[in-house]
Swiss-Prot record:
Gene: engB
Coiled coil feature spans: none
Membrane spanning residue stretches: none
GO biological process, one term: division septum assembly
Function field: Necessary for normal cell division and for the maintenance of normal septation.
Cofactor: Mg(2+)
Region entry Disordered, spans: 219-245
Record's protein name: Probable GTP-binding protein EngB
Gene3D superfamilies, A to Z: P-loop containing nucleotide triphosphate hydrolases (3.40.50.300)
Naturally occurring in which organism (per UniProt): Polaromonas sp. (strain JS666 / ATCC BAA-500)
Length: 245
């Protein structure tokens, strides 16, 4: 698959993971980068990309806006299922991009024509399977519904890449609508559905889980550098043989 390759933004050196305050300050640098109706229109990037996915009305745009502390960075259409583009947002201080957030269209809204649904299933599947710089996926889910059939299909698509090291997190949004007993039950059920994957409660209204998720995003985008391999020692020179004349 080929795609256009616009000029790449400058890339920052890897940073050391720090506390949630640093992570939130970094997320606040988010700026709109580009939008693409199809995968082939996305720019090729060398920085880590973190994708947000989920059903329509799962609170995806609100979650992104809360994490970045910006009111309208991610646009939430008044008509669920209307947004049908992948939106990228650059992250990085002093104009140096060191990661990108990807806001994928919500899925599962009944009023969307079947043709559009099928096209977006293909686009999302191709994106999740082939996007080279994709390092992590955040799946947003309404805990009152649990993971739906479409969510579980998405998990199946992701599973091979997760086994290869792709980071994955399920966020139970709107958790402020649950009491403690309901929240604990929702966590248990979704953890089983997600095959033991990482699942957390999140509430934009109560700011529950915001700092913890921000720290996850920071750590995924700034993995510790692997220690450089020591060069192999040169074989000792063999002693010269024979008499010198």
């Amino acid at each position: 698959m080929t795609s256009s390759s616009p000029a790449r933004p400058p890339v920052a050196a890897a940073s050391t993971p720090s506390d949630a305050k640093v992570a939130l300050g970094w997320l606040h640098t988010a700026k709109f980068l580009t939008t693409a109706p199809e995968l082939k229109h996305l720019p090729r990037l060398d920085v880590p990309e973190i994708a947000f996915v989920g059903r329509s009305n799962a609170g995806k745009s609100t979650c992104i806006n809360t994490l970045t502390q910006q009111h309208r960075l991610a646009f939430a259409s008044k008509t669920p299922g209307r947004t049908q583009s992948i939106n990228l947002f650059s992250l990085g201080k002093q104009g140096v991009t060191d990661a990108v957030l990807a806001d994928l269209p919500g899925y599962g809204y009944a009023a969307v024509p079947k043709e559009a649904k099928y096209r977006w299933q293909q686009v999302m599947g191709n994106y999740l399977q082939t996007r080279d710089n994709l390092k992590a996926v955040v799946l947003l889910c309404d805990p009152r519904l649990g993971l739906t059939e479409l969510d579980e299909i998405l998990l199946d698509v992701l599973r091979p890449r997760v086994e290869e090291g792709l980071k994955f997190l399920v966020l139970l949004t709107k958790s402020d609508k649950l009491n403690k007993t309901e929240a604990a039950k929702a966590l248990s059920i979704v953890r089983l559905q997600a095959g033991g994957g990482d699942v957390k409660l999140f509430s934009s209204l109560k700011r529950k889980g915001v700092e913890e998720v921000a720290q996850h995003l920071w750590d995924w985008a700034h993995p510790p550098e692997k220690p450089a391999k020591k060069p192999k020692a040169e074989p000792a020179a063999e002693a010269a043989t024979g008499d010198e004349g």
